[in-house]
């Protein structure tokens, strides 16, 4: 029922119900997409994140979107790549699962994901794309939510396009 769209762009400009933040466990901002989302949302996001007491790897928490076009930010903590034998695939799939679960529980109809864990956490992009698409596809097959994967570059987008 839902559909997946893959695009290149700035996730902070997504005009849907929610964007997903690839956060660190503190939820207090950082580099990459995490820093960009915190900067674009404004200081209120950090204030709300301080009340959440962090987030374990593979899990997700929701906040308001504040100055973002999206109404909500769903923060998820992706795994750091340590060779693939330390539960990384399951933890990455859990990021997508728990984020979508929160969105569906809230009745959201559109959500945008970044490429979780593929930056400084060094998750191999081809494997991350495969896990993302399989997990998302399984969940939205019979649910009315549209998912956009917002890639950082055309090269990143290719990893998702070739998985289709």
Swiss-Prot record:
<dbReference type="InterPro" id="IPR002589">
    <property type="entry name" value="Macro_dom"/>
</dbReference>
<comment type="similarity">
    <text>Belongs to the MacroD-type family.</text>
</comment>
<protein>
    <recommendedName>
        <fullName>Macro domain-containing protein PG1779</fullName>
    </recommendedName>
</protein>
<dbReference type="InterPro" id="IPR043472">
    <property type="entry name" value="Macro_dom-like"/>
</dbReference>
<feature type="domain" description="Macro">
    <location>
        <begin position="1"/>
        <end position="164"/>
    </location>
</feature>
<dbReference type="Pfam" id="PF01661">
    <property type="entry name" value="Macro"/>
</dbReference>
């Amino acid at each position: 029922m839902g559909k997946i769209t893959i695009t290149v762009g700035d996730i902070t400009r997504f005009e849907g119900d929610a964007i997903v933040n690839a956060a660190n466990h503190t939820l207090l901002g950082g580099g990459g997409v995490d820093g960009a989302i915190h900067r674009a949302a404004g200081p209120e996001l950090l204030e709300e994140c301080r009340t959440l007491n962090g987030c374990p790897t593979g899990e997700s928490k929701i906040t308001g979107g504040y100055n973002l076009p999206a109404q909500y930010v769903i923060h998820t903590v992706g795994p750091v790549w340590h060779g693939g034998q330390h539960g990384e695939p399951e933890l990455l799939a859990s990021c997508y699962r728990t984020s979508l679960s929160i969105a569906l529980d809230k009745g959201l109809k559109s959500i945008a994901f970044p490429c979780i864990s593929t930056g400084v956490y060094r998750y191999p992009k081809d494997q991350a794309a495969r896990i993302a698409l399989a997990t998302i596809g399984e969940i939205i097959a019979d649910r009315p939510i549209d998912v956009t994967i917002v890639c950082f570059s055309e090269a990143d987008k290719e990893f998702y396009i070739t998985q289709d």
